[in-house]
Amino acid sequence: MDEQEPAPKRGRRFKEQTPVQRALGLLVRREHSRKELNRKLLARGIEPDAAQAAVDRLTDEGWQDDTRFAAAVVRNRAGSGYGPLHIRAELGTHGLDSEAISAALAAFEGDWTENARDLIRRRFGEQGPTDLPQRRKAADLLARRGFEGNSIRAATRFDLED
């Protein structure tokens, strides 16, 4: 019998993606800040000038928007039980300036004190913290989660008639 050479593979040949296509691929999964998107493109081997040009183009075309990104992070983290101090710090790590962060937090339509109370209800039950050690634990939890002092005091007081 003859030994046959294997037939050449007829798989698809993928073109190398452009920097804009790679950035758009990241943005369709979730929102990214300009700094974060640029960093991820650089990590994928895109040249710095090409990465910056791709981010600029997607920003100009409305695919990337730091304001929209900040609002999404605020909504998501507030819904997960985090307070404004934690969210402000996280947005800072994403490279947003303080004005954009303040605007996103100001645009949040929820009530931070009510969010703190909801978190306490989930952790301590509907009656809330009943004695001083539980109130301290609740206050510590809220402080770790980034709530401000006024919200912590109001939430750990836990008078449902407030």
From Swiss-Prot:
HAMAP family: RecX (MF_01114). One of its GO terms (cellular component) is cytoplasm. Modulates RecA activity. Its main location: cytoplasm. Belongs to the RecX family. The keyword tRNA-binding does not apply. Keywords: Cytoplasm. It comes from Xanthomonas axonopodis pv. citri (strain 306). It is found in: Cytoplasm. This is Regulatory protein RecX. Disulfide bonds: none annotated. It comes from the Bacteria. InterPro entries: RecX_HTH_1st, RecX_HTH_2nd, RecX_HTH_3rd, Regulatory_RecX, WH-like_DNA-bd_sf. GO terms for biological process: regulation of DNA repair.
